[in-house]
Regions:
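Conserved short hydrophobic interaction patches
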Residues: 23-25, 76, 146, 150
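Short beta-strand micro-motifs in enzyme catalytic cores
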Residues: 2, 49-51, 109
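Hydrophobic-ligand binding "helix-grip"
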Residues: 29-33, 58-112, 116-118
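Short coil-to-beta transition motif at edge beta-strands of beta-rich domains
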Residues: 46-56
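Hydrophobic ligand-binding cavity/cleft-lining segments
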Residues: 1-46, 170-172
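Short acidic/glycine-enriched loop/turn segments that link adjacent beta-strands
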Residues: 45-47, 92-93
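A conserved amphipathic terminal alpha-helix motif
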Residues: 116-172
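Generic structural detector for well-ordered beta-strands
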Residues: 7-11, 54, 72, 100
């Protein structure tokens, strides 16, 4: 079994970061090979949400460099934390992850992420589990940090008051 822990500080309040993780509108296309499709939205706070994710995996797994996971979310505490359980492929694996948002004040949040990963097949577990999980985790860390910081910038820009351009004609 592999364990991955990651923490990153981002420019955004826990509420802003939460709104990005739990966004339920149309998804923006990505060039990173990552997509998240909501299969079931869960209750009003997201408890029971089910999602299908695609992500990059090493090409030597002969899947065209694409992995899949089916994830369900539980233990949801709005603007604070959630847990997910997942089944994924290739390597047919089980994962469990937890995300916690720590308010640092001054509009900043530290995101704590922990995941355990276990390939079902004992031969593939011995040969590939560590390398594959390291590849996926490294990619996720970079993508999450970039996406959250970019998303918070877009949220704040959308909320910023619009200023009217000054008239080119002077009033008498």
């Amino acid at each position: 079994m592999q364990v991955h822990r990651y923490a990153v500080e981002v420019e955004g309040t826990p509420a802003e970061v939460w709104s990005l993780f739990w966004y339920r509108g149309p998804r923006r296309p990505t060039s990173s090979g990552v997509s998240i499709e909501i299969l079931h939205p869960g209750d009003e706070v997201g408890e029971g949400l089910i999602r299908h994710c695609t992500f990059r995996v090493p090409r030597y797994l002969m899947t065209g460099g694409v992995g899949h996971s089916w994830e369900w979310l539980t233990e949801v505490t709005p603007t604070t934390s959630w847990k997910y359980d997942a089944v994924g492929k290739p390597l047919w694996s089980r994962a469990e992850g937890r995300t916690e948002l720590e308010d640092l004040g001054e509009g900043r949040t530290r995101i704590h992420f922990t995941e355990t990963y276990h390939a079902f097949n004992p031969v593939l577990r011995a040969l590939l589990e560590r390398r594959v999980h390291r590849f996926i985790s490294k990619d996720n860390d970079r993508l999450i940090t970039t996406a959250i910081n970019d998303g918070v910038r877009r949220l704040r820009a959308a909320r910023a008051p619009r200023t009217e351009p000054e008239s080119a004609v002077d009033e008498p």
